[in-house]
Structures are given as C-alpha cells and as structure tokens.
C-alpha cells in the first residue's frame, strides 16, 4: 500500500507560466513584462516560486531585437533571475533576416527555439499556464 503524500509546503510550490508575445507594440511588450514581474512578485511574497518563459514570434520578435523598446527591462530581468527565460522564434528570425538581406541580431538574453508556436504548445503540454497580454 502507498502512503498518502504529505502537504506541499509553500517553499516547494512552483508555478509555471508561458507568456505569448506576437505584437510589435511597445505597450504590449511592457504589459507582458509587467505581468511577468507581478506574477513573480506575488508568488515570492507567498514563499513560492514562479518559472516563466516569454515566447516571441511574428511581429513580437521585435521585442528581442537590438533596438527593442524593452531591451533594458529584459537585460535586468535576466540578470535578476534564471527563472525567467526569453525565447525567440527561429522561423520568424529567418524570415525577417531574409527580408532584410542580412542577419538581424537579437538580444543575448533571447534563446532561439525552432518555432514560437510549437514552443508554446510544448510548454502548455508540459503543464505551463498560458498568458497572452
């Protein structure tokens, strides 16, 4: 017979969030980052952990370009916590680079994933909650 598991303590509680950005509007980018910060602050106040991945594709990939209007915020968030990841769609990056006739550099904080849409599917299938600001 298997014994019942004991209660989960707050320090063991982990929340997973996938944030979807496909809009080049700086207000949307800032809202996404505000949501990330608010979620992490809320759970930290309860002694719990929040692991977040921000996935950008399509026009939202501008969030990770060198001239991003939220570049400083992304750099700061990445330095503050390894529990926030930034994922960039390789499909979008390839198409934007082809259109520009040159490789478009992205922020070092953004890791390339083969497809932003597929990454969001994988995260949700893995138990992540989904948010599209």
Language model features: what each stretch is:
Residues 50-64, 92:
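Acidic helix-start/capping segments at beta-turn-to-alpha-helix junctions
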Residues 21-33:
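Short, glycine-rich nucleotide/cofactor-binding loops
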Residues 65-133:
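A cross-taxonomic marker for long C-terminal extensions/tails that follow the last structured domain
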Residues 11-24, 54-57:
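Acidic/histidine-rich, surface-exposed loop or edge segments in extracytoplasmic proteins
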Residues 30-45:
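Histidine-anchored nucleotide/phosphate-binding helix
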Residues 44-53, 88, 132:
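Surface-exposed patches in mature extracellular/periplasmic domains of secreted proteins
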Residues 10-11, 44-46, 78:
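Short, conserved, surface-exposed binding loops centered on an aromatic residue
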Residues 2-7:
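C-terminal segment of classical bacterial N-terminal signal peptides
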